[in-house]
Curated annotation (Swiss-Prot):
The gene is yneP. InterPro entries: 4-hydroxybenzoyl-CoA_TE (IPR050563), HotDog_dom_sf (IPR029069), YbgC/YbaW (IPR006684). This is Putative acyl-CoA thioesterase YneP. Its EC number is 3.1.2.-. Has acyl-CoA thioesterase activity.
């Protein structure tokens, strides 16, 4: 299983009135982690889009454990939790500077045609990605 690791410095604008990271910003960081994982595997999401394919989120689950604060550095760990050639489930752990788990999450994605939004078979449309995902998954 390949785990991508990406550091993110918490910016002031990402915090709320309580002085902690606003909950929705973790979703943005998950996307940053997912993009880093794809790059680690030798691909670019933008190349998929150039071929007229999008990969929307179809399900998301997030559990908040410990808050992060302005000025701290978060570390996003991302991996392929499950993959069946059609749907990909990415797993995420985001850690605080003490190495404590801040969030635990998954997001599920499928591929669709950009124009029709009809689902497509990832393994058929991107056989090289398929091979890499099979090797990298949990």
């Amino acid at each position: 299983m390949h785990v991508s690791k990406k550091e993110i410095e918490v910016r002031y604008a990402e915090t709320d009135q309580m002085g902690i990271v606003y909950h929705a910003n973790y979703l943005v960081w998950m996307e940053v982690g997912r993009t880093a994982l794809i790059k680690d595997l030798g691909f670019l999401y933008s190349d998929m889009e150039k071929k007229g394919v999008l990969s929307p989120v179809v399900d998301i689950n997030i559990s908040y454990k410990k808050p992060l604060h302005y000025g701290e550095t978060a570390v996003v760990h991302t991996w392929i939790e499950d993959y069946n050639g059609f749907k990909t489930v990415y797993g995420y752990h985001i850690y605080n500077p003490a190495g404590e788990l801040s969030i635990k999450a998954t997001s599920s994605h499928i591929c669709v045609d950009k124009e029709s939004f009809k689902p497509i078979q990832f393994r058929k449309a991107f056989p090289d990605w398929h091979t890499a995902y099979e090797k990298a998954k949990k």
